[in-house]
Amino acid sequence: MITAMGNSGICPGDVMGLTNGLASPPGKKPLFSFGIISDVQYADIPDGHSFHGVPRYYRHSIHVLQRAIQEWNSHQDLNFVINFGDIKVNYEFQKSNRPVYHLIGNHCLYNLPRDKLLPLLKIPGINGLAYYEFSPSPEYRIVVLDGYDISAIGWPQGHPKTLKALEFLEKKNPNSDKNSPEGLQGLDRRFVMFNGAVGREQLEWLDGTLQDATKLKQKVIVCCHLPFDDVASDQEALLWNYDEVMNIIHQYNCVKACLSGHDHRGGYSIDSHGVHHRSFEAALECPPDTDAYGHIDVYDDRLLLFGADRMQNTEMYFNS
């Protein structure tokens, strides 16, 4: 049975989308499996609301993470965990008995500068940048992008990347509050301060990494806090230069899925080149006694996302 997620950015025509009764293929073991969670944003403050009036459960989100860690620790075949960004505390992740790979989000950068954040999260970045890659099996490569490479947050005042981002926002967003998309139309709504861009050096690295994966006949999963597709995400959550990133990705056949956080509602799409896009439902927006986390089983021909509660199951078959 195929289901669509109402207002969650899922395109009902995407027949390779979501199922309620998701099951592993009979007789096949995954090549590897990994846990996923995004946008925990725990804080010891009263519940609040987003810019759009969506409830946020700041104190409860830590319980979502605790239940996720407990579930992952008991999963015999889980290989690692990916946190898709926006955490304010790290100690719960330290209870994981599997390796945890972190992506940085805007709320991470609001709380700590990069020079403190990256060592704390054990991100193997260079020159303060948080992009890297690893290969959990010979058949696959995971590529992690730093969506706040060019950003008005996280870098020191006066840093060239900060100045470049502020200059860019001044041209693109006429509002005095650069976090507001008011008056911006369509895809231009992404030009807000809580988003960012992938810089030139990182784009060249991505291109080289995908070239190498192609030579090795590896499939690639690209991960970034910020989404790259406006069907799988609200327009105002998109990476500023998502089009440049996707232009590189679409030059190769190796990238099978782009996974992200930031959007909070969650969403799914398949683009015109057959690349799957999945933005994950936020732990922050789980009312008490509900959850949003999951794990992904990776096969040679598909990804199967098994979600807890508000995290929707997703079946992602590859075209080739």
Language-model features: where?
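N-terminal active-site segment of His-dependent metallophosphoesterases
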Residues: I2-K88
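Extended active-site neighborhood of metal-dependent phosphoesterases/phosphodiesterases
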Residues: T3-P26, F51-P55, V89-L216, N241-C254, ...
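A general structural motif
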Residues: L31, L78, N97, K217-K219, ...
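Active-site glycine-centered loops adjacent to acidic/histidine catalytic or metal-binding residues
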Residues: D39, G85-D86, G105-N106, H225, ...
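Short, solvent-exposed loop/turn segments at secondary-structure junctions
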Residues: D44, D229-A232, L238, G267
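Short acidic, glycine-rich surface-loop motifs adjacent to enzyme active sites
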Residues: Q211-V231
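Histidine-centered catalytic micro-motifs
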Residues: V222-F228, K256-G266
